[in-house]
């Protein structure tokens, strides 16, 4: 099973992502959730997730700094970015830093998320 850490400062988004799919049938397990990048880094160092699904705009540490710091620390995990933030430069930075892809929160669907997960797997 691929271990997944969900990182978003909006509780409703974390709940929606958890309930959107039958994660186990796709070969994934949600090992935890975090509310900001700093909390996610601490959890990732303990849990070693295979995938971190993260927002870009969060308090304390945003998604860009989370990806950058995780890569600097040689954490071996994939990143899938979800956000309402549509600024191309911000998204491009996440992709250049190594995010696998980017999904807009407003358009996320079970089908789109499943497609992204299958690409990562």
Residue locations for each model-derived region?
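Alpha-helical/coil-rich non-catalytic "connector" segments in signaling and regulatory proteins
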Residues: 1-121
């Amino acid at each position: 099973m691929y271990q997944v850490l969900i990182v978003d400062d909006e509780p409703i988004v974390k709940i929606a992502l958890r309930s959107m799919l039958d994660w186990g049938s796709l070969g994934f397990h949600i090992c935890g959730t975090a509310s900001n990048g700093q909390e996610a880094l601490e959890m990732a160092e303990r849990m070693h997730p295979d995938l971190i699904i993260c927002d870009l705009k969060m308090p304390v540490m945003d998604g860009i700094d989370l990806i950058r710091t995780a890569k600097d620390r040689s954490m071996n995990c994939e990143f899938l970015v979800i956000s309402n933030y549509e600024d191309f430069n911000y998204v491009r930075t996440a992709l250049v830093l190594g995010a696998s892809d980017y999904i807009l929160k407003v358009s996320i669907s079970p089908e789109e998320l499943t497609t992204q997960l299958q690409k990562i797997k």
